[in-house]
Amino acid sequence: MEKALILITAYLLGSIPFALLVGKIGYGIDIREHGSGNLGGTNTFRVLGVKAGMIVTCGDMLKGTLAASLPVLFSVHIHPLLAGVCAVIGHTYPIFAKFRGGKAVATSAGVMLFYSPFLFVSLLTVFFIVLYISKYVSLSSMLAGVYAVIYTIFFTDDIPLMIAVSLLTAFIFYRHRANIKRIVNKTEPKIKWLGRK
């Protein structure tokens, strides 16, 4: 029963739609009706600007970090990564936003922040290097995931981490399939650092 409660709580944490809340409370708009319609940090940056984008991205990451920490905080014998994955599912298919959520990147990163801080920092490094070169947030997210898979397979012996990272990366690619088509067609929007404040 305790295990089920932890997993349900993790899903509900992940379901908190920070992009929707920030858009409605802070700006009076439903972000699902603007930009890509995605409830995530990237769309928030594009539609509402840097400040709102940072708040949403940090909030989405925090969901993953808190969810992964639940088994430890409550001394429940369940793997933190499993709770973290439940939060990612909640973020992507949130019960509080008609199951229309984000693309799993920030919340997945938050899970890694709790479980493997070194991997988190190296992921962030890869993300920003690719972002600096390509100016594509989507490509940066996917290649950071590829790096994570390679790193966990060849440089760790943590089987649960390998499985979780592989599944999350595959899921991130799935959620970015429209972005992949736009990158191939050269119609994917590139980042613009200046936005509405």
From Swiss-Prot:
One Gene Ontology term, aspect cellular component: plasma membrane
GO annotation, biological process: phospholipid biosynthetic process
Similarity field: Belongs to the PlsY family.
InterPro entries, per database record: G3P_acylTferase_PlsY
Transmembrane stretches, start-end: 5-25, 70-90, 111-131, 153-173
Enzyme class: transferase
Protein name as catalogued: Glycerol-3-phosphate acyltransferase
Membrane disposition: Multi-pass membrane protein
Enzyme Commission number: 2.3.1.275
Organism the protein comes from: Geobacillus sp. (strain WCH70)
Role description: Catalyzes the transfer of an acyl group from acyl-phosphate (acyl-PO(4)) to glycerol-3-phosphate (G3P) to form lysophosphatidic acid (LPA). This enzyme utilizes acyl-phosphate as fatty acyl donor, but not acyl-CoA or acyl-ACP.
Main location: membrane
Keywords assigned: Cell membrane, Lipid biosynthesis, Lipid metabolism, Membrane, Phospholipid biosynthesis, Phospholipid metabolism, Transferase, Transmembrane, Transmembrane helix
